[in-house]
Amino acid sequence: MTLPLLGPMSLSGFEHPWFFLFFLVVLGLVALYVIVQMGRHRRMLRFANMELLESVAPKRPSRWRHLPAVLLILSLMSFTVAMAGPTHDVRIPRNRAVVMLVIDVSQSMRATDVAPNRLVAAQEAAKQFADQLTPGINLGLIAYAGTATVLVSPTTNREATKAAIDKLQLADRTATGEGIFTALQAVATVGAVIGGGDEPPPARIVLMSDGKETVPSNPDNPKGAYTAARTAKDQGVPISTVSFGTPYGYVEINDQRQPVPVDDEMLKKIADLSGGDAFTASSLEQLKQVFTNLQEQIGYETIKGDASVGWLRIGSLVLALAALGALLINRRLPN
């Protein structure tokens, strides 16, 4: 947690836990203080004439005289926690990552169960995703129907990606596996170019589709969607799938109404096989929310951050109060 004016504080994730041995020193000081106070009390009892003692000694201090010592002990405890190096989770924007946005442009995307139609709604949500994605991430775009095409290689230029999204055109058939394989190739290519570390940059595929793969007919074929998902898993590239549409969608083909219900099951299996997440949306607003959630998930990473500052500041504040209390409470000179 982070407290106003004090900063981050935590009681977990200690980097130097052996500093807690200093608590033994603190306990020793507590024991020493108790022994000194007990000895002081015994010496007072040995004074034969208590009335004379009270007349010549300053007014006996109240129990408040122990407050400075208590505050000193608390400050030492706070400093001990700080020295142990507590940490907390910190979300920071990714500056080195690749995201491939893979969009289905098969004829089923003409369905109007999502106004004005599935493709137009997908374009609007995809552009919002591009705008919201953290600036350091390289975003690429692939459109697929019977074949897959890299429209924009991974880049931080969001305007180029949005311009390509606006130009998406419908085509026949649905080769989901080819779309995934093409995305994996683009990820590998840009990973070799970006470099900048001991390992390739983290990558993710965001696959947006409304229906079942038609080419090939068996998704377990060498070029099928399930095979591609397993390959993505092996390469450490999870796939986040977004199934978009309703069970009641249809398109007109040769004056015949052809049902094109959304296929949530296939897209969920693709996500599961790749180690990614599956999302569903049946309206434009739901789709926008899905992409907002994806942006939060993809655009940031969680790292361990220092959480000792708050303990140091509390310890310093309590130590200052202990010194002030010692001056005000235990002073010997009368006003």
From Swiss-Prot:
GO terms for cellular component: plasma membrane. This is UPF0353 protein Mvan_2751. Keywords: Cell membrane, Membrane, Transmembrane, Transmembrane helix. Its main location: membrane. NCBIfam families: PRK13685.1 (NF010238). The chain crosses the membrane at residues 18-38, 67-87, 309-329. It holds the Pfam family BatA. Belongs to the UPF0353 family. Gene3D superfamilies: von Willebrand factor, type A domain. The keyword Kinase does not apply. It is a multi-pass membrane protein. The keyword Transmembrane helix applies. It is found in: Cell membrane. It comes from the Bacteria. Residues 98-294 form the VWFA domain.
